[in-house]
């Protein structure tokens, strides 16, 4: 189960990174 928890947390981390990159992209245009 720890593997699933890690994957879940990691996907949340990737989502937050993607959101930040998206905001940066919006600001730069």
Swiss-Prot record:
Family listed: Belongs to the glucagon family.
Pfam families hit by this protein: Hormone_2
Source organism: Didelphis virginiana (North American opossum)
Keyword flag Membrane: no
Listed GO biological process terms: adenylate cyclase-modulating G protein-coupled receptor signaling pathway; negative regulation of apoptotic process; positive regulation of insulin secretion involved in cellular response to glucose stimulus; protein kinase A signaling
Locations listed in the record: Secreted
Protein name as catalogued: Glucagon
Gene Ontology CC annotations of this record: extracellular space
Gene3D superfamilies, sorted: 6.10.250.590
Superkingdom per UniProt: Eukaryota
Sites bearing Phosphoserine, chain numbering: 2
Keywords from the named record: Hormone, Phosphoprotein, Secreted
